[in-house]
Amino acid sequence: MSTRGKHLFYRDRKEWNDITPVPQDDNGRHIVNIAYSEAFVDAHDYFRAVLIKNELTERTFSLTSEILLMNPANYTAWEYRRRIIKEISSDLNAELRFVARLIEEYSKNYQLWHHRQWIVEELSKQIANGSCNSLTHLSSDELRFTDDVISDDPKNYHAWQHRRWIVSFFKISVEEELAFTERMLLSDVHNNSAWNHRFYVVMLDEGLSPSVLTREIDFVQKRISFAPNNESSWNYFYGLLVPFVHNRKYIYSETSKPSDEKSSSNETDFMPKLQLMLKFVEDLMAVDRTVVDCLAPLSFVVEVYTDYLKLHFMKQSNGGGTLGKQDSPHVDASTGDSLNITYDPKTIFDRAISLCDRLANEVDRIRASYWQYRARQLMCFTKNFNLPCDIIIS
């Protein structure tokens, strides 16, 4: 009998005598033969045969287990296995354990995480009309599982994506996830995955009410003070700005759900926050002179200047006049000298162009073309509103 150690080939198993194996068809055009093991060839020949027959039985379920242990990335095998599971009503909890063992070894495999999500969805359907405690137990188990994987690999994209799905699917409490991200960022403030997860929790699950905005500004500023050149935290900081300039749907009042309506007061209401953000950069530069040459905060200031000008001209074009002096912040981030708040949009425009020039020629020369493009973009934008500009981009 053909065996290798304890392995019994399918061709030698009596219960498979009714199946004619289907060998792999390479059309005779292969340049280099892949050195498949004999067991691999044997199992896949039988797999192709039952797949053609669409046999959904216990033995084909066992066959897919062996196929997937040989190659966990075999999407066809996973899809076939799901059809078998539904047909034979296989134990989904056992299936969770099976895929968990594979994830322990292959944690960055797309097919494994997709299959796990499918299992959780099917399990939730089974217990939908049963005990709420069972559903809570399932969600807790999934959070704990992703926590374990992330603890081993804090930037595992697949685990973070699965956790994001779990939070949305089970409507996990915002407080629980904020605490989780805070713990992860305490461990590594540069963990962009943790910042990204927190952003989605705040924007999609909680909503950016005035009190939430204040809390998150305080949260991110403390992390920036600890690591001023951390691009992830500056991106998060800027992300808090984006809804007010580009997309209203994430903005909540304290008592209402988000709305797509554009409120003429949004821009003005946000200006004190914008001023505080820029004042924070000013103070940071005054305390730590190295920040003046850091790419991340300087890039942040360019974005804030740009968005300020957009808000200013949006209000002007809507017939609301110009933003008043009390609403119009300016920080001279191009020099790092003692900074004064000024109010003239033309001055802000000039400083933005000057900062783009400094980034292109001193701080971020490898992306000089990008910063030159940003300067030209600003000039084209302001020309549409008849803002005079006599700056030549170098």
Q: Predicted segment positions?
A:
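Residue signature of alpha-solenoid helical repeat architecture, marking inter-repeat boundaries
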Residues: 55-58, 72-75, 107-110, 154, ...
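A conserved position within tetratricopeptide repeats
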Residues: 48-51, 64-72, 85, 100-107, ...
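Eukaryotic gene-expression regulator signature that favors modular helical reader/repeat domains
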Residues: 96, 149-151, 251-252, 292
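Helix-turn-helix repeat elements of alpha-solenoid scaffolds
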Residues: 38-40, 52-57, 88-93, 134-140, ...
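Eukaryote-skewed repeat-based solenoidal scaffolds used as protein-protein interaction platforms
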Residues: 97-228
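Extreme N-terminal leader/anchor segments
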Residues: 1-73, 85, 91-92
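Non-catalytic amphipathic alpha-helical adaptor/oligomerization segments
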Residues: 45, 54-126, 161-162, 166, ...
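Structured C-terminal portions of repeat-based eukaryotic scaffold domains
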Residues: 199, 203-394
